[in-house]
UniProtKB/Swiss-Prot annotation:
This is Large ribosomal subunit protein uL11. It comes from Prochlorococcus marinus (strain MIT 9312). Part of the ribosomal stalk of the 50S ribosomal subunit. Interacts with L10 and the large rRNA to form the base of the stalk. L10 forms an elongated spine to which L12 dimers bind in a sequential fashion forming a multimeric L10(L12)X complex. SMART domains: RL11. GO terms for biological process: translation. One or more lysine residues are methylated. One of its GO terms (molecular function) is large ribosomal subunit rRNA binding. GO terms for cellular component: cytosolic large ribosomal subunit. The keyword rRNA-binding applies. CDD domains: Ribosomal_L11 (cd00349). InterPro entries: Ribosomal_uL11, Ribosomal_uL11_bac-typ, Ribosomal_uL11_C, Ribosomal_uL11_C_sf, Ribosomal_uL11_CS, Ribosomal_uL11_N, Ribosomal_uL11_N_sf. NCBIfam families: L11_bact. Forms part of the ribosomal stalk which helps the ribosome interact with GTP-bound translation factors. It holds the Pfam family Ribosomal_L11.
């Protein structure tokens, strides 16, 4: 018989830099999970993606064991890195804070495709383009 899931915890952590300090410690500690075991596994799995924030979904079972799934970095983070800016515009309708090319947009869309509710790269590009537009980043040919 399959183990029963008692909690699903969603966190966004720096790749390769998870430690028992908040937010990891309190979130996992209240469910009785071995925090250091999670930190070691997460850091090993994400060390090649250093510099990115990687969302993770942790399933905690009734025997206090756990499994986790890492997601792709948020689209906003990928867009700001591609555009070379610190953050998006507070008022996206008033002007552009940066540019990304169609090729960069396609690369981001291919990266995000597994986590998006899209079946093709073209539809994923439209989703990412909308995110970029809302951040005040323009798309150039």
């Amino acid at each position: 018989m399959a183990k029963k899931i008692v909690a699903v915890i969603k966190l966004a952590l720096q790749a390769g830099k998870a430690n028992p300090a908040p937010p990891v410690g309190p979130a996992l500690g209240q469910h009785g999970v071995n925090i250091m075991a999670f930190c070691k596994e997460y850091n090993a799995k994400t060390q090649d993606k250093a510099g990115f924030v990687i969302p993770v979904e942790i399933s905690v079972f009734e025997d206090r064991s756990f499994t986790f799934i890492t997601k792709t970095p948020p689209a906003a983070v990928l867009i700001t890195k591609a555009a070379g800016i610190d953050k998006g515009s507070g008022e996206s309708s008033k002007g552009s804070v940066g540019n990304i090319s169609k090729a960069q947009l396609e690369e981001i869309a291919k990266t995000k495709l597994p986590d998006l509710n899209c079946s093709s790269v073209e539809s994923a590009m439209k989703v990412i383009e909308g995110t970029a537009r809302n951040m005040g980043v323009s798309i150039t040919d």
